[in-house]
Amino acid sequence: MSDLVITRPDDWHLHLRDGDALATTVPATARLFSRAIVMPNLVPPVTHTAQAEAYRHRILSHVPAGAAFDPLMTLYLTNNTSPEEIVAARQSGIVYGCKLYPAGATTNSDAGVTDVANVFSVLEKMSDMGMPLLIHGEVVQADVDIFDREKRFIDETLTPLTERFPNLKIVLEHITTRDAVEFVNQAGSNVGATITAHHLLYNRNHMLVGGIRPHFYCLPILKRSEHQLALRDAAASGSDRFFLGTDSAPHPKEKKEAACGCAGCFTAPSALELYAEAFDELGALDKLEGFASLHGPTFYGLPINSGKVRLSKQEWTMPASMALGDSSIVPFRAGETIRWKAELL
């Protein structure tokens, strides 16, 4: 198959950053995606509904003329988040989830939750109100190997959490392991997961063999090929428990190409095309529309988009760099061939 038309997709996990960066990040996503769940890990983090509303307005001010893009906002859970804030967020009509970052797990997560028990009253309110909990599922103890942190989180935190709150809607974000796939498959229908394009296409060998590739470095980190294969099987299975979430996470070039570089891959400029590449490799292009356009809205209880996108097997070259405020950014697969081309119909 060299040409297909799918329902316009959504991105259920996206970092847009703030300030001048929005001039680059917002158009990159609004090019093809109708909606996106916007991560709240700014500095300072988006912890209150009023902050989410202000951030949403800043994002909308950078949507290109004629484009239709709806940012779906989230709140950053802290030890001090109150059940009352959850009520306000739900009633706002613009907040669609709350993000649980174990403190120190990833970029700008220092204000995160230090012990999930600290937010049990908040999770109870979220469960009652149907507000999804979005989880970065890694433990943060220094003595736990970085490649084992997702499995340990599932065993030590997520499993007891789902037992305590059996009706809480949970998205285990950017899953990277066979363990996560098995957990989601065995959990109730209130548990789903997002999968990134880079975790479908690559494993840790691609990042480390023959030289360190800093633009492949992300958190959760790329894993062994056996875990990559499990993710590919899950995405191509047609299960509505798995859906598209790019985790596109931009950082300036100097913060990636450094002695201690930041985690995150800026995949937004070619995100849908990269997913098409992965599904094409799997012989599962017929499953792409469900994964990219149908499963996410169904999980969140939102309408399916009415627009369409055409994907054609047409090669093009990703630019070597792009402007990012006063700096520049190296997009994922910079200077390399992208095998599919997408356009909004």
Swiss-Prot record:
Catalyzes the reversible cyclization of carbamoyl aspartate to dihydroorotate. The keyword Metal-binding applies. One of its GO terms (cellular component) is cytosol. Pathway: Pyrimidine metabolism; UMP biosynthesis via de novo pathway; (S)-dihydroorotate from bicarbonate: step 3/3. Keywords: Hydrolase, Metal-binding, Pyrimidine biosynthesis, Zinc. It comes from Hahella chejuensis (strain KCTC 2396). Its EC number is 3.5.2.3. Zn(2+) 2 binds at K99, H136, H174. The keyword Transmembrane does not apply. The active site is at D247. Zn(2+) 1 binds at H13, H15, K99, D247. This is Dihydroorotase.
